[in-house]
């Protein structure tokens, strides 16, 4: 009989075989067995082993048998053994001798163990319970699981994994099934083990080809979650096949699982070995026998599912039939229960709800066709809510689901999965199985990419997206996968080096979001594939250095020089900026194509999203400059320069300039043919979680306002990131619209490298700290899916290490530069001497004529017609007002070949109905732009100039940023932005502070943008009075911009022309008039346009003409702007010859030489006053009060101020109070 006291049970043969090998050669046995085998004593056999014997002749056998003495047969012993087994059954039965030619062999090893074990099993009185369990839910959920694993990490879950785990859970409810019988001191005893150790029968093939069966145990199963159980299961099987099992693996099995169903057996009653209380058998999954001849369609129609037969063979001495039956019933219920499958899915990180068990719905197939179509529509509208896009999965208990996406919500069940329904062209078919429909829908909308396009109103765009998204994605080739991996290698290598070399330095690392590098690379590559000219990138500081190195191609040496604190020697002047704000330019070459494309990264400040409108303006300027093939095959502009804009999630949702910039997307004056937006969504804003930083479901919801498609993509899936990037470019090219990619990722470190994010986000960073990076995860996924081999992965790793080494080598060769104080940029650009801004009278006349050169049949508005006639009159006779003086400047520049762009709120007509640059037909609405006629010479040839004038949206931040960007993209253009009232320019203060006033000093980025800011105290209240002169003067330094407040149309004319023609790229700020627009004295004569140039300091005309006597003047009033006309009127009224008024037309840089020359003409002056309308703490005085005495200490050391009192608001809200204050200023000035 078997040695039932052995802890190895049916594995005893293997132990004995190992012992014999160990005895002959200890080195032939795994060292883990040595300690056990030294003390092992095998059970002695009852007979010596014999070699196989071939019987040569029946006759010899008969004679041998006859010669042997024969004992009479004993009567059979019918006494029952103590365990109820009839002893006679154990007696050897006489067997006829083998026939001639038969091969006779004594059974050894596993075969002998089977004999011994089976004989031993006869001592266990067993009974068997049988239960048929529906297998459909098991089959369907396993399909879902394995499809997800195939897409991600690879591997499979077997039916045995699931059944074994259900068995273990059932044992928890019925612990008696885990007991076994023994005798202690001759007394029958039931033993309840402390743990459930599940025995698995593993079929092994030896080197000689013979197969053997071992039973290894998974220990302490009741303590495991499903993922742990699967890991332990796979470990046992792997070590068994590798011959690495230890003594511990064989000992202590308490309950066994056998699966003869794998060979087609439907029902099995296995033998139960001593030492166990039960063995569970699993039969084959089959349809009921009576349906096995039915077609698949008929089976689906009837709702027939496969069954699996479970048997429980148990020791009847300690387990009763009711317990065994309930045990099987519990397994049955588990395999159909929601809770069991929820746990399995969570443990395997399957982000979707499992298929649910339900009864079949008897509704008609016609009704269900409609339900299937509703389900398809639901996935197209809501599928993104179920997409597996979060690489952190912080809420692991939450499934990605939505009621609209559940088949049960639509009156469908798992029984409908294999039924065929009408799908009306979905995925190119008229009829499909629901299973296939669901598979396609989930693949399209619910995997690592979530697509939002239901908000798009254009059916063509929606259909295009559906066709592209619902088509099976073409898997990248091995070469493409290796290329993606190489980009991840480069991204991670760069960050790893910086982290080790420059510990603690701020660099705003890309770690956790490395997939943005292959994503950007793919987008640029696709742009090159389309034959476009350039990609211009705008982005914040997060990951900027990585983009500079691995996308734009900025040399590592330059980047590391900046890390060392050295400015680029080519930018010796200026204050410079931190390394993660700088721009660069490079050339991108396709890896798998023959095209190339220019790539540039524009400089940015730390003000998040401020660069957005700047980028759009820069791109529009480049497009206008190229102007080649301006109409594509679809009759649209060929927008061959592509803006690629990166954002952070918190900033995209939180910064208002994002909405302002998006609003520009489809406007005629601002359209760039679509921007590719990539949101690096690390799911945190500094320390703020999304639930505190936005009210919307997604950070991208603001983009729905312009009908942009939105793609949410898992940053841990670089292949999905690459696919989405290419699709985004294709959509942009097809429809000339914005596209938004929301790449969900995480931030490996804090907001900067010195910050500890776990202080405020501990749970998130517990997850992040243990998470593999995208490069490692992708490598493992490629190997797990079988896409690349281990060798190829090792080659990629060597490439990664090689790139690290290359970085180190470049750093070693860096030359250190000595740090010097920064120098001013003021002297870098000087006004050329003798610059002429006057024009010929004939050009003035031509511009005047243009306003009456209306197209045939054009009817001007009756209130506009007199204005046009007056302009023609002024062009010939003089008395030119402010508005026409401005148009003369712009028109003359167009005639000289300049591109002139004017924009602003209501700028075509003018806020004060003064400009009328675009005329509207009173009856047809047709538009006519007179100054555009100046783009053609009198002989019909083009001048090369253009006049572009646009009414802007009601925006300052984005509008000013756009115009600034336009000047960066086209330095030769004359670009003007006009505020509706100067007060509102503070809506663009970030652009003024970060770009206009300091861009040259920080980045060497030049701009000649013009801001026209209506300014003046006229009693219209504090919000329609001041353009905040004091703020611009405070920002001025190093010649960073020109600030002017001209008081005559001709001086304004020359100021604009000087700015356009002097070759200096610096902004111009002009404080323009309001009431002075129609002031009768504020006019200029023709000679003022044809004979002189801009004058930064103006005297009164009486002194300039030699009429006034300067020697009588004892007081000088210095002033600017329209206040001059009020002072001049009061002087004339009071007949004050002792007082002169001098106008500073240019406020910065202060015209020191001109001012001195002017003041020196007045030899008897004793008092100097600065007179302004603005309060004492506003206007020019806060700067002039300090600067004028330093500028001319011999004259202006004692200069005094005349103004309103210091005020917190620019003016009073009462027009009557305004009039009183204005009178007080005049009275004091003439007191």
UniProtKB/Swiss-Prot annotation:
Comment text on domains: Is a fusion protein with two major domains exhibiting structural features of an E1 and E2 protein, and a short sequence stretch of E1 localized at the N-terminus, which is connected by a linker region to the rest of the protein.
InterPro entries for this protein: 2-oxoacid_DH_actylTfrase, 2-oxogl_dehyd_N, 2oxoglutarate_DH_E1, CAT-like_dom_sf, DH_E1, KGD_C_sf, ODO-1/KGD_C, THDP-binding
Binding residue positions for acetyl-CoA: 1042, 1058, 1093, 1096, 1146, 1153-1154
Similarity field: Belongs to the 2-oxoacid dehydrogenase family. Kgd subfamily.
Start-end of Basic and acidic residues biased regions: 24-37
Protein name: Multifunctional 2-oxoglutarate metabolism enzyme
Region feature Succinyltransferase E2, mapped onto this chain: 89-337
Coiled coil regions in record: 787-817
Activity regulation comment: Alpha-ketoglutarate dehydrogenase and decarboxylase activities are inhibited by unphosphorylated GarA, and allosterically activated by acetyl-CoA, the main substrate of the TCA cycle.
Keyword Lyase attached: yes
Domain of life: Bacteria
Reaction(s) this enzyme catalyzes, per UniProt: glyoxylate + 2-oxoglutarate + H(+) = 2-hydroxy-3-oxoadipate + CO2; 2-oxoglutarate + H(+) = succinate semialdehyde + CO2; N(6)-[(R)-lipoyl]-L-lysyl-[protein] + 2-oxoglutarate + H(+) = N(6)-[(R)-S(8)-succinyldihydrolipoyl]-L-lysyl-[protein] + CO2; N(6)-[(R)-dihydrolipoyl]-L-lysyl-[protein] + succinyl-CoA = N(6)-[(R)-S(8)-succinyldihydrolipoyl]-L-lysyl-[protein] + CoA
Main function: Shows three enzymatic activities that share a first common step, the attack of thiamine-PP on 2-oxoglutarate (alpha-ketoglutarate, KG), leading to the formation of an enamine-thiamine-PP intermediate upon decarboxylation. Thus, displays KGD activity, catalyzing the decarboxylation from five-carbon 2-oxoglutarate to four-carbon succinate semialdehyde (SSA).
Upper classification of the organism: Bacteria, Bacillati, Actinomycetota, Actinomycetes, Mycobacteriales
Region (2-oxoglutarate dehydrogenase E1, C-terminal part): 338-1231
Spans annotated as Disordered: 24-56
Binding site for 2-oxoglutarate: 581, 606, 1024
The encoding gene: kgd
Quaternary organization: Homodimer. The 2-oxoglutarate dehydrogenase (ODH) complex contains multiple copies of three enzymatic components: 2-oxoglutarate dehydrogenase (E1), dihydrolipoamide succinyltransferase (E2) and lipoamide dehydrogenase (E3).
PANTHER family linked: 2-OXOADIPATE DEHYDROGENASE COMPLEX COMPONENT E1 (PTHR23152:SF4), 2-OXOGLUTARATE DEHYDROGENASE (PTHR23152)
E.C. numbers: 2.2.1.5, 4.1.1.71, 1.2.4.2, 2.3.1.61
SMART domains cross-referenced by the UniProt entry: Transket_pyr (SM00861)
Pathway the protein contributes to: Carbohydrate metabolism; tricarboxylic acid cycle; succinate from 2-oxoglutarate (transferase route): step 1/2; Carbohydrate metabolism; tricarboxylic acid cycle; succinyl-CoA from 2-oxoglutarate (dehydrogenase route): step 1/1
């Amino acid at each position: 009989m078997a040695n039932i006291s052995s802890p190895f049970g049916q594995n005893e043969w293997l132990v004995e075989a190992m012992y014999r090998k160990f005895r002959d050669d200890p080195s032939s046995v795994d060292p883990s067995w040595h300690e056990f085998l030294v003390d092992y004593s095998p059970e002695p056999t009852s007979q010596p082993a014999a070699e196989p014997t071939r019987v040569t002749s029946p006759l010899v056998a008969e004679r041998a048998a006859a010669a042997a003495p024969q004992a009479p047969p004993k009567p059979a012993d019918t006494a029952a053994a103590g365990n109820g087994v009839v002893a006679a059954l154990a007696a050897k039965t006489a067997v006829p001798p083998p026939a001639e030619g038969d091969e006779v062999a004594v059974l050894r090893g596993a075969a002998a163990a089977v004999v011994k074990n089976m004989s031993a099993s006869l001592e266990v009185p067993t009974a068997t319970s049988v239960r048929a369990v529906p297998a459909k839910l098991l089959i369907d959920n396993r399909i879902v699981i394995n499809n997800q694993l195939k897409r991600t990490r690879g591997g499979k879950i077997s039916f045995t994994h699931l059944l074994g785990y259900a068995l273990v859970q059932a044992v928890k409810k019925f612990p008696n099934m885990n007991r076994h019988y023994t005798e202690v001191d001759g007394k029958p005893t039931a033993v309840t083990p402390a743990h459930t150790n599940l025995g698995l029968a593993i079929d092994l093939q030896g080197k000689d080809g013979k197969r053997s069966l071992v039973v290894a145990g998974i220990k302490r199963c009741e303590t495991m979650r499903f993922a742990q159980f699967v890991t332990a299961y796979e470990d046992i099987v792997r070590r068994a096949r590798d011959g690495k099992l230890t003594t511990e693996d064989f000992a202590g099995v308490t309950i066994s699982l056998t699966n003869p169903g794998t060979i087609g057996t439907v029902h099995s009653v296995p033998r139960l070995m001593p030492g166990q209380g039960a063995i569970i058998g699993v039969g084959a999954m089959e349809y009921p026998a009576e349906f096995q001849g039915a077609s698949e369609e008929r089976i689906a129609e009837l709702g027939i599912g496969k069954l699996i037969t479970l048997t429980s063979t148990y020791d009847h001495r300690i387990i009763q039939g009711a317990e065994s039956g309930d045990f099987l019933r519990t397994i049955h219920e588990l395999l159909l229960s929601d809770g069991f499958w929820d746990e399995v899915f969570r443990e395997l990180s399957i982000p979707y709800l499992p298929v649910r068990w339900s009864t079949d719905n008897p509704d008609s197939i016609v009704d269900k066709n409609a339900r299937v179509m509703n389900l398809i529509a639901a996935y197209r509208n809501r599928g993104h809510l179920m997409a597996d896009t979060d690489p952190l999965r912080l809420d692991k208990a939450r499934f990605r689901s939505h009621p609209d996406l559940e088949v049960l919500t639509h009156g469908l069940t798992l029984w409908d999965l294999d039924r065929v329904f009408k799908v009306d062209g979905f995925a190119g078919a008229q009829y499909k199985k629901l299973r296939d429909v669901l598979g396609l829908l989930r693949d399209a909308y619910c995997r690592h990419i979530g697509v939002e396009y239901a908000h798009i109103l254009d059916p063509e765009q929606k259909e295009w997206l559906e066709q592209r998204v619902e088509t099976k994605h073409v898997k990248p080739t091995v070469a493409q996968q290796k290329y993606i991996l190489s980009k991840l290698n480069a991204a991670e290598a760069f960050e790893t080096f910086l982290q080790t070399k420059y510990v603690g330095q701020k660099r705003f690392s890309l770690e956790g979001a490395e997939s943005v590098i292959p994503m950007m690379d793919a987008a640029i590559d696709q742009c090159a594939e389309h034959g476009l000219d350039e990609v211009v990138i705008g982005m914040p500081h997060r990951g900027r250095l990585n983009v500079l190195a691995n996308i734009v191609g900025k040399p590592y040496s330059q980047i590391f020089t900046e890390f060392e604190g050295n400015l680029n020697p080519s930018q010796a002047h200026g204050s410079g900026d931190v390394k993660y704000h700088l721009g660069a330019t490079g050339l991108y070459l396709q890896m798998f194509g023959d095209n190339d494309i220019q790539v540039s990264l524009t400089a940015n400040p730390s003000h998040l999203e401020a660069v957005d409108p700047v980028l759009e303006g820069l791109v529009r300027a480049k497009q206008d400059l190229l102007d080649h093939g301006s109409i594509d095959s679809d009759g649209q502009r060929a927008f061959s320069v592509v803006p690629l804009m990166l954002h952070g999630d918190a900033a995209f949702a939180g910064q208002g300039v994002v909405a302002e910039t998006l609003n520009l997307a489809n406007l005629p004056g601002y359209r760039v043919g679509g921007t590719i937006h990539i949101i690096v969504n690390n799911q945190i804003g500094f320390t703020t979680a999304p639930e505190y930083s936005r009210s919307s479901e997604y950070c991208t919801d603001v983009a729905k306002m312009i009908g942009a498609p939105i793609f949410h993509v898992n940053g841990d899936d670089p292949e999905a990131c690459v696919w989405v990037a290419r699709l985004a470019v294709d959509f942009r090219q097809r429809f000339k619209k914005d596209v938004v990619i929301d790449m969900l990722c995480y931030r490996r470190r804090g907001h900067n490298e010195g910050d500890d994010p776990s202080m405020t986000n501990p749970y998130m960073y517990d997850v992040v700290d243990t998470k593999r990076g995208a490069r490692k995860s992708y490598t493992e996924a490629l190997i797990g899916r079988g896409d690349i081999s281990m060798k190829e992965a090792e080659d990629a790793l060597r490439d990664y290490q090689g790139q690290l080494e290359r970085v180190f080598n470049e750093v070693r060769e860096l030359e250190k530069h000595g740090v010097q104080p920064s120098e001013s940029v003021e002297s870098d650009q000087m006004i050329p001497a003798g610059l002429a801004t006057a024009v010929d009278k004939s050009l003035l006349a031509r511009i005047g004529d243009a306003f009456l050169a209306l197209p045939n049949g054009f009817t001007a508005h009756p209130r506009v017609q007199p204005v046009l006639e007056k302009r023609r009159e002024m062009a010939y006779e003089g008395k030119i007002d402010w508005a026409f003086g401005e148009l003369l400047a712009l028109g003359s520049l167009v005639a000289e070949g300049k591109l002139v762009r004017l924009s602003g709120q209501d700028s075509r007509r003018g806020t004060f109905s003064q400009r009328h640059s675009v005329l509207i037909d009173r009856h047809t609405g047709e538009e006519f732009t007179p100054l555009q006629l100046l783009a053609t010479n009198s002989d019909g040839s083009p001048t090369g100039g253009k006049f572009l004038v646009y009414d802007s949206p009601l925006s300052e931040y984005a509008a000013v940023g756009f115009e600034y960007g336009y000047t960066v993209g086209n330095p030769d253009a004359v670009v003007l932005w006009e505020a509706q009232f100067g007060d509102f320019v503070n809506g663009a203060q970030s652009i003024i502070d970060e770009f206009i006033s300091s861009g040259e000093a920080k980045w060497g980025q030049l701009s000649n943008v013009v801001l026209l800011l209506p300014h003046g105290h006229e009693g219209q209240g504090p919000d329609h009075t001041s353009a905040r002169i004091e703020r611009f003067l405070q920002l001025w330094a190093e010649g960073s911009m020109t600030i002017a407040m001209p008081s005559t149309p001709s001086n304004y004319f020359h100021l604009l022309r000087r700015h356009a023609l002097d070759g200096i790229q610096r902004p111009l700020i002009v404080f323009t008039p309001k009431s002075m627009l129609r002031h009768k004295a504020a006019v200029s004569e023709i000679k003022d346009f044809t004979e002189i140039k801009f004058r930064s300091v103006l005297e009164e005309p009486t002194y300039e003409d030699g009429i006034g006597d300067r020697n009588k003047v004892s007081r000088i009033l210095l002033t600017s702007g329209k206040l001059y006309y009020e002072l001049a009127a009061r002087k004339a009224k009071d007949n004050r010859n002792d007082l002169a008024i001098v106008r500073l037309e240019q406020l910065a840089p202060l015209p020191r030489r001109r001012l001195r020359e002017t003041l020196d003409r007045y030899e008897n002056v004793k008092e100097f006053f600065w007179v302004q309308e603005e309060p004492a703490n506003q206007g020019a005085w806060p700067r002039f009060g300090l600067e004028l005495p330093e500028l001319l200490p011999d004259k202006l050391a004692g200069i005094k101020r005349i103004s309103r009192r210091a005020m917190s608001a620019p003016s009073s809200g009462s027009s009557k109070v305004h009039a009183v204050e204005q009178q007080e200023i005049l009275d004091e000035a003439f007191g």
